């Protein structure tokens, strides 16, 4: 299987998942603890990038997405989402209360206000998702 991780990085992650310390892994792999630390750090960075890439792919293929600006009251978001969904002919399988509860749990908000810009979108499986990647799909489609 193709992966972004090297064989050594996979070994380190497997052994860490089993609860081994970096020094113990270093002995098993016949290397230094510092090298194990670097391998683990780079592996986790690659995993984070892969997760972000998949989230971006979901956003690109989203049925409906709404940009939320820093300082915006999240109570206005469900109405915007429903309006965009109506325009796209998509049924949102969530109530206003469910959308707000999702935002409270997953979005960068404080006291009902967005702390920074983000996107809420309905993915291809009708799941609500949050992304920090503010791509304007409407603008791209016009070009």
From Swiss-Prot:
Transmembrane segments: none
Gene3D superfamilies, sorted: DNA-binding protein Tfx superfamily, archaea
GO molecular function: DNA binding; DNA-binding transcription factor activity
Annotated signal sequence range: none
Taxonomic superkingdom: Archaea
GO biological process, any: DNA-templated transcription initiation
InterPro entries reported in the protein's UniProt record: RNA_pol_sigma70_r4 (IPR007630), Tfx_C (IPR029291), Tfx_DNA-bd_arc (IPR004645), Tfx_DNA-bd_euryarc (IPR018384), Tfx_DNA-bd_sf_arc (IPR036657)
SS bonds (residue pairs): none
Keyword Nucleotide-binding: no
Keywords: DNA-binding, Transcription, Transcription regulation
Keyword DNA-binding: yes
Protein purpose: Putative transcriptional regulator.
Family the UniProt entry places it in: Belongs to the Tfx family.
Protein name stated in the entry: Putative transcriptional regulatory protein PH0763
Organism: Pyrococcus horikoshii (strain ATCC 700860 / DSM 12428 / JCM 9974 / NBRC 100139 / OT-3)
């Amino acid at each position: 299987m193709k992966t972004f991780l090297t064989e050594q990085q996979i070994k380190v992650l497997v052994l860490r998942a089993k609860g081994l310390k970096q020094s113990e892994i270093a002995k098993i792999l016949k290397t230094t603890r510092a090298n194990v630390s670097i391998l683990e750090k780079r592996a986790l960075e690659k995993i984070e990038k892969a997760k972000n890439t998949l989230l971006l792919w979901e956003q690109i293929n989203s049925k409906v997405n709404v940009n939320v600006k820093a300082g915006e009251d999240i109570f206005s978001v469900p109405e915007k989402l429903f309006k965009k969904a109506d325009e796209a002919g998509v049924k949102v399988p969530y109530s206003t209360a469910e959308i707000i509860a999702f935002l409270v749990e997953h979005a960068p908000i404080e006291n009902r206000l967005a702390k920074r810009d983000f996107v809420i979108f309905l993915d291809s499986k009708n799941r609500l998702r949050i992304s920090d990647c503010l791509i304007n799909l409407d603008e791209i489609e016009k070009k």
